């Protein structure tokens, strides 16, 4: 299993709006992607920092979601509330409950 971690910083006072978009639009879209397993958004309402973690069945599934433009499309849904560009990282999931 593989994880994509995307860190964002929301404009002041906009982290709740970002969480709503993530919950109501991004997660439903993710569920339609091949190999998608799970998603969560961690937020700090004081700093406006958000960390998205998505889990993928295989590395190929994760990379395909990037190559297809899916990830860019989802980040575009957050563009109006972000203070800067997101940072993307990928990881092998070494342990999970």
Give the location of each predicted region.
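Intrinsically disordered, low-complexity acidic/polar segments
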Residues: 15-17, 61-63, 97
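Short, surface-exposed ligand-recognition loops at beta-strand->loop->(often short) alpha-helix junctions
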Residues: 9-19
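An amphipathic, aromatic/His-enriched active-site/gating alpha helix that lines ligand/cofactor pockets
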Residues: 24-37, 55-89
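Intrinsically disordered, low-complexity segments enriched in polar/charged residues with Gly/Pro
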Residues: 14-16, 26-29, 41-42
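Glycine-rich beta-strand-turn "strand-cap" elements at beta-sheet edges
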Residues: 2, 7-11, 37-47, 74-97
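Short, charged/polar surface micro-motifs in flexible loops or helix N-caps
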Residues: 12, 47-48, 58-62
């Amino acid at each position: 299993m593989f994880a994509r971690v995307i860190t964002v910083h929301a404009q002041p006072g906009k982290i709740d709006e970002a969480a709503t978009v993530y919950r109501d639009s991004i997660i439903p879209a993710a569920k339609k992607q091949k190999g998608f397993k799970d998603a969560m958004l961690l937020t700090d309402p004081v700093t406006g920092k958000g960390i998205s973690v998505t889990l993928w069945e295989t590395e190929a599934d994760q990379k395909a979601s990037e190559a297809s433009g899916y990830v860019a499309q989802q980040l575009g849904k957050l563009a109006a509330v972000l203070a800067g560009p997101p940072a993307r990282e990928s990881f092998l999931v070494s342990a999970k409950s």
